[in-house]
A protein has these predicted regions:
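Helix N-cap at the start of a conserved alpha-helix in ABC-type nucleotide-binding domains
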Residues: 82-84
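Catalytic Walker B motif of ABC-type/P-loop ATPase nucleotide-binding domains
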Residues: 71-75, 80
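C-terminal coupling/interaction segments
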Residues: 162, 166-206
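Short loop/turn segments at beta->alpha junctions
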Residues: 12, 133, 190-193
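ABC transporter nucleotide-binding domain
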Residues: 89-174
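ABC-family P-loop ATPase nucleotide-binding domains
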Residues: 2-59
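Conserved catalytic motifs of ABC-family nucleotide-binding domains
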Residues: 67
Length: 206
C-alpha cells in the first residue's frame, strides 16, 4: 500500500478489479465488494475522482481481498483527516486480530504507532537507531527533568540514558522510569511516548 494511489487515473474501481483478479489465485470478490461498500467507494468511480483517503482505502481493500498475510504500508495515514485515519487504523487492528497476520507500517505520525504497533523501529538516513517493543517505550521509559548539575550523576548511574540540554535545565531519556524514581526520587520523571523516544535517540547525547 503506497502513499499515493498507483492505479491509472482514468480507470474505474470495477476496471481495477478486472485487471487485478487474474493476478491473485485467492482473490475474493465478495470480500472486496463488502470492503468498498464499508468505505463508501462506488465501483463506477474513476481513480482521479477519489480523494487521497479514498485512494488509500481502495488500496487497502485490494490488499485485504487476495489472502495476504502481511501488509506493507508506506505513510498510509499521512494527510488524512482524523476520521479516515481512525478507520484505517481500526481496520489494521482487525487484520492482525487473529495473530496469524502482520502489518509493516512506515509512518512519521508517532501517535499512530503508539496506537497500533507492537514493535517500533526508528530509522535515520538508512540507519537503524533503535528497535524496541512499543510497550518498552510507552510503558517503561521516561523523561526526567533535572538541573544541568545533576546530569553527570544520572548518566553515570543510568545505562542507556540520553540527555537533551534546554536553556535553563536538561531532559534525560531513561530506559526505566520506575527504577529511576527509586534511585532519584527528587527528580521529576514523566512517561515517554514514541515521539519523545525518537527525538532523544536522534538528538540526545551521553
Amino acid at each position: 500500500v503506497l502513499d499515493a494511489c498507483p492505479f491509472p487515473s482514468e480507470l474505474r474501481v470495477s476496471q481495477v478489479v478486472t485487471c487485478l483478479r487474474p493476478a491473485f489465485s485467492q482473490w475474493d470478490d465478495s470480500l472486496f465488494g463488502g470492503l468498498i461498500a464499508r468505505f463508501g467507494i462506488n465501483s463506477n468511480t474513476k481513480m482521479k475522482e477519489l480523494s487521497r483517503g479514498m485512494g488509500m482505502k481502495l488500496q487497502i481493500a485490494v490488499a485485504l481481498s487476495h489472502g495476504a498475510d502481511l501488509l506493507l504500508l508506506d505513510e498510509a495515514t499521512a494527510g488524512l483527516d482524523p476520521l479516515a485515519r481512525d478507520e484505517i487504523l481500526d481496520m489494521l487492528q482487525e487484520f492482525v486480530g487473529d495473530g496469524e497476520r502482520g502489518v509493516l507500517l512506515s509512518s512519521h505520525i508517532t501517535s499512530d504507532l503508539e496506537r497500533v504497533a507492537d514493535r517500533v523501529v526508528g530509522i535515520d538516513v538508512g540507519r537503524i537507531i533503535f528497535d524496541a517493543p512499543r510497550e518498552t517505550i510507552t510503558d517503561t521509559a521516561g523523561i526526567a527533568h533535572c538541573a544541568a548539575s545533576q546530569v553527570a550523576e544520572i548518566l553515570e548511574c543510568v545505562p542507556g540514558a540520553r540527555v537533551v540540554k534546554r536553556e535553563f535545565s536538561c531532559d534525560v531519556l531513561v530506559p526505566n522510569r520506575f527504577e529511576f524514581a527509586q534511585a532519584f526520587p527528587e527528580v521529576a520523571c514523566d512517561r515517554a511516548n514514541v515521539g519523545d523516544y525518537l527525538h532523544f535517540m536522534l538528538k540526545g547525547g551521553r
